[in-house]
Amino acid sequence: MSELTQEFTDKLYANYQANVKFAALENAITHNGIHAALETRKSAIENTPVFSLDLTKDKVTDQKASGRCWMFAALNTFRHKMIASFQLEDFELSQAHTFFWDKYEKSNWFLEQIIATADQDLTSRKVAFLLQTPQQDGGQWDMVVSLFEKYGVVPKSVYPESISSSNSRELNTYLNKLLRQDAQILRELLATGANQATVQSKKEELLQEIFNFLAMSLGLPPRTFSFSYRDKDNNFHTESGLTPQSFYKKYVDLQLEDYVSVINAPTADKPYGQSYTVEMLGNVVGSREVRYLNVPMERLKELAISQMKAGETVWFGSDVGQVSNRKAGILATDVYDFEAGMDIQLTQDKAGRLDYAESLMTHAMVLTGVDLDEAGRPLKWKVENSWGDKVGTDGYFVASDAWMDEYTYQIVIRKELLTAEELAAYEAEPIVLAPWDPMGALASN
């Protein structure tokens, strides 16, 4: 190994002090911060929130201090349909209801994974991966579908937010304490030679404790409820005796098996035209597995535009923290000028960022519009976020087309939009990716 010598450091000092621009930038950045000093005027001008195709102006939602973006994005696609179908002024489905059942199911999923890996050492990478974070707030499209299909949905008025759903840190801390403790109990029980019936009985006993903890923290979810509302014409509507499943069937009425996940992961280990899944990724035991079809980025954008032209918004996953201005609501590759400002070259491409852990899916949002040029090519995209209405334009963001190319990884579209060849590839036996693959990262936040 080569040490850093004083002579080398002296050389760096001299080079820095010889560049008069650096002194000005040092003053600007130390007083204002990197982003404020390097923010470009050009990016704000080019990414105004005006779009040739704009599907909704509904009020945005707010996930607050939680990692429920994937749920919010899915429920937002549903509520847009409901607002239009039932002529509502505004409406939200309960994100907390889906959150409760996700925590419950993830706990069982984790314990089943612990049982399945009981023959491996605690130091094995898979067991260590499980124990590092037994569960968290994140998830994937197929995971939220599994929850909707099993538990339905309810209006937010029926099961509102709690402190622990809006700010989930305490909940996650103590739920993970319980799960790690339960993992030890089950592994030690299995080490004694206990049969599966005994192990499952113990697991059910542990799940009762977890269920009690969740119910006390989030509130006990309703089994039946009434739903009343007034439409835009002030007509009153009410219905009683609903269950979460019957409410979903009557008021949402989407066939979720008609939707598929399409990704753009341009790395050497993931050839296009193949389907993929991620080992140990899921929540509901016995439900559909997480599955993606990998396609080139141009095809992914073409599919998203086709769905929006048909009048339907698009759930999508991206790395939202990359070159973004949260306050202004701008996602653009040129929002900050590091090259002119600091002589820093950020040239790593999308594949390189994935391979070297610089980028991964961190956030799910909804595409609700796009600005197309005369030839039908996208210039910028309208993004419905779930960070409240104090950021962006009333909570909506603008993503430049270049930003979409570099930092968008997944969309969910109707499978009827796929070609016969693409659909066959999606339905083929998927290639299994490692549990820590970046294509599973959205579920790890």
Mark where each language-model region is.
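N-terminal regions that are enriched for targeting/export leaders
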Residues: 2-58
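Bimodal feature
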Residues: 2-22, 72-75, 88, 400, ...
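Active-site nucleophile-adjacent alpha helix/oxyanion-hole segment immediately C-terminal to the catalytic cysteine
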Residues: 44-314, 391-394, 401, 409
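Short helix/strand-bridging catalytic loops that position acidic/His residues to coordinate divalent metals
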Residues: 54-58, 350-352, 384
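Catalytic nucleophile-His microenvironment captured as a short glycine-rich beta-strand/loop
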Residues: 69, 148, 355-388
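Short His-Asn-centered micro-motif
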Residues: 72, 316-319, 368
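Long, positively charged binding patches that form subdomain-scale interaction surfaces
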Residues: 287-362
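Conserved catalytic-core surface of thiol
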Residues: 373, 379-445
